Regions:
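Phosphate-backbone binding interfaces of nucleic-acid-interacting proteins
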Residues: 1-140
Length: 140
């Protein structure tokens, strides 16, 4: 498939280009602007990151979100990152989701990431931003 072709509903569940990279097709269902605008996307800085005990997947992030309070978000990215390599990184989070308890720890938000397959192997990349962007900056 040419990289410039548009993904349509006729495309199967996975799109593969000539590099062996597979991506999921675009959603067909549209979200109205009012619904989308309720999501609060903010820049966060990783102050600390550690593996969650008894979990193979979860990392616990302590984040600066530009407020006086430190934010905790858990994310199932341990298969793709070691905790120490994420300290100091600038990431993107949705911060107005209700807290969700995982492994007895409240996760207050969601870090955004991109998922794709390369030659059948799943890859994940956290959305990392320029370090010059301050914690708490709102994305529009």
């Amino acid at each position: 498939m040419d990289n410039n072709e548009v993904v349509t509903e006729e495309v199967a569940a996975v799109v593969e280009n000539n590099t062996g990279i597979e991506i999921e097709p675009l959603f067909e269902e549209q979200v109205d602007f009012d619904t989308f605008s309720k999501s609060d996307f903010r820049v966060v800085k990783v102050k600390n990151c550690e593996a969650v005990p008894k979990s193979k997947k979860l990392l616990r992030f302590k984040l600066d979100d530009g407020t006086e309070n430190e934010r905790t978000i858990l994310s199932g990215v341990h298969a793709f990152y070691e905790p120490e390599e994420l300290v100091g990184k600038t990431l993107l989070a949705i911060v107005n989701l209700p807290p969700r308890s995982m492994m007895g720890i409240d996760s207050c938000g969601m870090l955004l990431s991109a998922i794709h397959n390369v030659n059948g192997e799943e890859k994940l990349n956290l959305v990392m931003l320029d370090d010059a962007i301050p914690a708490g900056a709102k994305l529009h």
